[in-house]
Amino acid sequence: MIETFQAVLPHGITLSCRASGPAGAPVLLFLHGFPEAAFVWDELLEHFGTRYRCVAPNLRGFEQSSSPKEPEAYRVKHLMADVEALIAQVSPGGAPLEALVAHDWGGAVAWSFAVQRPQLLKRLVIVNSPHPATFLRELKNNPVQQAASAYMNFLCRPDAEALLAADDFRRMWPMFTNMGAADPARKGGGWLTPQVREQYRAVWGAGLTGGCNYYRASPLRPPTSPDDAIMKLEFAPEFVTVKVPTLVIWAEEDSALPPSLIDGLEAYIPALRLVRVPGATHWIVHEQPELVAGEIERALAA
């Protein structure tokens, strides 16, 4: 059974959360991406809730969580502060998480969190979220990735949220349907049911500025000229090396995040287990929750 609560954090942010499992049990924390919300983890919360306290916050800017208007409030350091404060609230005695599980933008936060706060988690699980070093490499050098990520520059437009909300979110649905979400003949397809559409309408109707601000605040987006700041950006190894055991689940038919993003990943993650999933798309959590749960089970047992 899924419960909901409001986590009021000491630095003035409130996160609306979904949870399952007994209070006092070891904690699994799940971070969603864009344009999703905490509800995408419900099947995993119920699966693991028999043994763990499972918590999935709506990140700042999503659903009923605090949604600051200024893009600067969505820099990773602020998002990490939310996660750290939430862990202090939900983890008994401040014990480290059994696992931090994250997808898409949640993964962008989780990569940095694992590097900078390794004492707060025992293991990291990433689902189709590019490591910052390989993402930077591909954005700078790979025309395929530059084209696949071109939407990021659109989402930085000052009118992006108005355009996305127009005509019953007409520009939003193709993010899902272009990867087979409404096609029951496709493996894992057909998950975008009328009920799920209503869940998304409710989330998006609460506001899209927060979600767009993640892109506005990020230095990682495709260059539009050779002089763009990203072309001069470099990451020192100590800022991108993950020292906790890490599972990366990578759906190979992700049209926004091609598999080239996992090439060379082992250079940044000494304790890496990589699971490639042919035929699955960016929305693998919707498509194949049993597979995702099974791989997380293996990681927890290791």
Label the predicted regions.
Residues 2, 15, 55, 62-101, ...:
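Flexible "cap/lid" subdomain of the alpha/beta-hydrolase fold that forms the substrate-access gate
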Residues 3-10:
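Short acidic-hydrophobic surface loop/beta-edge motif
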Residues 9, 21-23, 48, 238-242:
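Short, flexible hinge/linker loops that cap or flank conserved catalytic cores
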Residues 11-19:
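A short loop-to-beta-strand scaffold at the N-terminal edge of the catalytic core in hydrolase folds
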Residues 18-67:
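Conserved HGGG/HGGXW glycine-rich cap/lid loop of the alpha/beta-hydrolase fold
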Residues 33, 75, 287-288:
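Active-site helix-initiating loop/hinge in glycosyltransferases
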Residues 35, 106, 285:
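Short active-site segment of divalent metal-dependent hydrolases/proteases
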Residues 280-289, 293:
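Catalytic histidine-centered segment of alpha/beta-hydrolase-like enzymes
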